Amino acid sequence: MTTGNTVYMSAKASLLRTPAKTVLLAGAMLSALGLATSVWASGDSGYCAPDWRLSAPSYDCAGRAMLSPGNDTRINMLLLMRSLRPASEDNDRDTYDTALGRTFFSWDSMSASLQRRPERKVELALGNCQIGAEGILAFRDALAAEKGLSAADRSGLDRLRAQVGCRAVEWGGFTAASAPGREFLAYLKAADAFYGGDWAGARAGFSALTGARSRWVAETARYMPIRIGLRAAVAEAVDQYGDFAGPDKANDEAVTSAHEAIDDYLKAYPNGRYATSAKGLIRRVAWLENDQATFAHLLENELATRPGNTAAAAALANEIDGKLLEQDGADAFIANLGNTPLLLTISNLKRMRSSSNEAMTLSADELAVQKNQFSAYGDLYGFLLATRSFQAQEQPATILRLLPDAARESRYTPLAFSRQVLRGMTLSRASDPNEAGFWRELLGGSSPTFQRPLVELGLATRWQRGPKLSDIFAPGSPVTDTSTRELLLQTRATPAILRAAARDPSRPLRERDIALFSLLFKQLNHGAYADFTKDLALVPTDADNRTGLWSFADQATIPVGLFSKGTWGDEFVCPSLDRTAAALARNPRDRKAQLCLGDFYRLNGFDGFRLFRPGPTADYLGYGPDGVPGRALYREDLYNEVIADRSAPADLRAYALYRAVMCYAPSGYSDCLGAARNDPENDAAAAPQSRRKAWFTELKQRYPDSQWAKDLRYYW
């Protein structure tokens, strides 16, 4: 199809989504039917580690409560809908995730929070059900409202309805005693034909019921031909993999039938119980007819009028994303329509993404040409201009003129909030002395669920750069979000801050344990052994030492007890860690104590472990010098020091050589260099194979009678 000079997407265009998204194309078939389904395009494919900063210049698996180029496009759509149809109060459900905190969220968690649990439970028959609880409950309500039904009829019909659409129905010779009961039974048999793919039988069955005495049966029978047409249209439109092959493969006759059925139903029941659904299915028909202009305009209208805090809004976002925005040529198509500013907003934000490998594709000239389309949305257009300028790193003064200060409002729509956060980000980039004051004022009207933590992130990022770091953890601090505080405790916090945080009974246990764990680990790792021996007394007697460190970022329990009751040694005998640390405090070159510290790391899961590592620039939370001074020493560093000491006792040098070689077993990559290093740093720090061979040879030749020479058979 062409619109003007723009060649629009082919019907079989690739459904490849934005990075970190995946698609199950089979969902598109069910979606085309108007059935409850989800096209799985998860913003956080697997584990999501967000970029802890306000800006998201490229796609980020973690969404923010502001319109942003880096957001999943569906998150931006919901935020836009909520801006146009704001709720009377903040009704976001808390979707706290330890890794994302309350500052970020995924599309999955956002959409799931909109799914309302039914007040009544429904037991579905076993099988591959094509129906949901809503259909069962609607049928049950219709039975209850039908006065002419006997109790036996109601019970039997309800039993049969639970089977229809799930498996072969056990009719069992059931016959309804009343006329309404016979109408409901005929309805169930027509529905069974529908779910079984007998389109002709279903049409005949429902057609015979459009004049039923039961108003529910009559209206539903007139509505169901829409569903029959849509399902028949795609029933055979599958490719070699069993996926939906695209609208151009749909059955045109069935699509036309569905279109006619919509007109017929809305003429008979313009305000009927299914009127909203029927009007929504006009979009499906337009899509299957490849009438993309009509489809896009219908989507635009839905964006403008649908409340953004419902499950239907999430379904609409999925539909727009999968059937329009992610199709080839969609951006140019939307721009050339000339009158779909809301769709254009979402497309523009996506086109503003940039990275080191890919430049932003939306130019200032293109955005200027679009101005007339936004005549009814001045604030939105101003935000787009400011966002593009910010992404292009243009002069802060230009951006600030587009975003007047409104930080003292009592409440913000997502768009209004986005404008103010972008203003704060621009103040930060300009090193404006009033930045912190701006963030503090913006806190007042921010919604507590996701907006306030984002503002706190802005304030904390500002305060971490100067003498105000301690204010973040002071009593009465406006920075209350535990995730933000925990990350700063692992990075910028000084020993004094860590000690105070570990003792603060007003804070959550996990935050206190993060503070104490960070303090003790860094003291060992940075060589502050005397301080470690003193602060070890802060570890509670019942502290956990069994949880491990594999999921430190999001595990509920922090194993602070590892430092007081961990494993001290195996074949190489070592004293408790407090005694090892005391020995190192007296003499940092105590070779036995150094080896025992290495064994503590090895035996308690510290190989590959790291505290939070901030991003590389000042706009990342945690960026800056480590709050605990000193160079970090990892296991291999300790072994190298012992090996370099030719005067060290033979048994200690032999063990150091053995452990240094074993660091590279069996992969050839060292486990002993600290996970905080990236691959190039690891490669630079790793011992070349020639050195590993030299360690192996020295152990075998200089200490042939040692246990460690006898145990070691290879080098890697």
PLM features per residue range, with description:
Residues 23-34:
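Bacterial N-terminal signal peptides
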Residues 39-206, 212-716:
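Alpha-helical solenoid repeat scaffolds
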